[in-house]
């Protein structure tokens, strides 16, 4: 069955394995996870738990900052006996009988050796050209060339008379939802509420990430 938890990427470091191998790891802090709602096949058509992460400030009238919860979010969290949460995600295909509304989900949900998928938001790179954004080849860098980093042809002239949808062109790069699959949990530190994940995960330091059992290898 699927397991999941929400957290923040702290940064990267390295640890030694039992065989002396040096392993690069990403440190993910995963505290304040609370089950806000249980969904079942009988009522909702599928099994899932809804998990909230990171407290928001209580509702405040006329508050314009998103640090404050709105009334519906505050009421939803109140049913679970929890503070309103900034991030809320669902994890499907879980054993809902193992969870109760209001229960805290801790890092010991996972253990060393588990294979997981990590979802985050990639670093924003701003407006970039086709070479950096899409990996296109550049033109000749010789003195006589007129095209060094230009994107080249974007379509036909008289026949199509338009640029087709999906044409790779310069534009804003990064800031996308990215999932890295089949990463390994190297270590779980229950004292500090952190999980050490082998390799790197999407996003900058302090970026929000979602960890769940690998969809390809986790249930074998």
From Swiss-Prot:
Keywords: Ribonucleoprotein, Ribosomal protein, RNA-binding, rRNA-binding
Entry-linked PROSITE patterns: RIBOSOMAL_L3
Tagged with keyword rRNA-binding: yes
InterPro entries with a match to the protein in the record: Ribosomal_uL3, Ribosomal_uL3_bac/org-type, Ribosomal_uL3_CS, Transl_B-barrel_sf
GO biological process: translation
Pfam families, per the entry: Ribosomal_L3 (PF00297)
GO (cellular component) term, any one: cytosolic large ribosomal subunit
Molecular-function GO terms, alphabetical: rRNA binding; structural constituent of ribosome
Family that this chain belongs to: Belongs to the universal ribosomal protein uL3 family.
Subunit note: Part of the 50S ribosomal subunit. Forms a cluster with proteins L14 and L19.
Function: One of the primary rRNA binding proteins, it binds directly near the 3'-end of the 23S rRNA, where it nucleates assembly of the 50S subunit.
Record-given protein name: Large ribosomal subunit protein uL3
Protein source organism: Staphylococcus haemolyticus (strain JCSC1435)
């Amino acid at each position: 069955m699927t397991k999941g938890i929400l957290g923040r990427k702290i940064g990267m470091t390295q640890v030694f394995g039992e065989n002396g191998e040096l392993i690069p790891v990403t440190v993910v802090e995963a505290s304040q996870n609370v089950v806000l709602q249980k969904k079942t096949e009988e009522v909702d058509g599928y099994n899932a738990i809804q998990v909230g992460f990171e407290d928001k400030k209580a509702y405040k009238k006329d508050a314009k900052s998103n640090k404050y919860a709105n009334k519906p979010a505050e009421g939803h969290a109140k049913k679970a006996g929890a503070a309103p949460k900034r991030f809320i995600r669902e994890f499907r295909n879980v054993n809902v009988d193992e969870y109760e509304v209001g229960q805290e989900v801790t890092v010991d949900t996972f253990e060393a050796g588990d294979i997981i998928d990590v979802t985050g938001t990639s670093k924003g790179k701003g407006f970039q050209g086709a070479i950096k954004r899409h990996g296109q080849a550049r033109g000749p860098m010789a003195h006589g060339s007129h095209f060094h980093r230009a994107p080249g042809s974007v379509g036909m002239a008289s026949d199509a008379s338009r640029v087709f949808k999906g044409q790779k062109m310069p534009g804003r790069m990064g800031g996308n939802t990215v999932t890295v699959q089949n990463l390994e949990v190297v270590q779980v530190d229950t004292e500090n509420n952190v999980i050490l994940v082998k390799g790197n995960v999407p996003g900058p330091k302090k970026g929000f990430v979602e960890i769940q059992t690998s969809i390809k290898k986790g249930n074998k």
